[in-house]
């Protein structure tokens, strides 16, 4: 009798764990800030969270581009960093304007984690800096591409879609350029 009760309890526990574990659910995606977005149209909180993360990410990359312009002597890195800063400043402005238009709060600085990353990277030797900087930007771009695609597939907001599509195209292009640049580092 005890075995049956334990078996039933174990099966119930396993069922609840699998059904409620977001990593096991097939109808969800994790976006940017680690918050889970369930399939379907995003609600206002999800859009606000997406926009806040997109804005902070653009601040992150502008700050990292500024660091590269100070720390690197590699002409390709310097050129890429300038393009990155210009492109993300434009994207940042577009995301901020949309968030403000929707009455959503707008972050005014980068993520705290990025401040720590900037501090760590600034301590790197010049040779190590270029490679570590490229790795960080590639990782950020990969995540950004995933977040943009996820929201693009979920929203029907025409203004948001327009900004996402522009940002997605430029982010993908920069990701590809930076991969090539990193592979050719001395």
Where are these regions (language model features)?
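His/Met- and acidic-residue-enriched segments that coordinate or traffic transition-metal cofactors
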Residues: 2-7, 20-186
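Sec-dependent N-terminal signal peptides
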Residues: 7-14
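C-terminal motif of bacterial Sec signal peptides marking the signal peptidase cleavage site
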Residues: 15-19
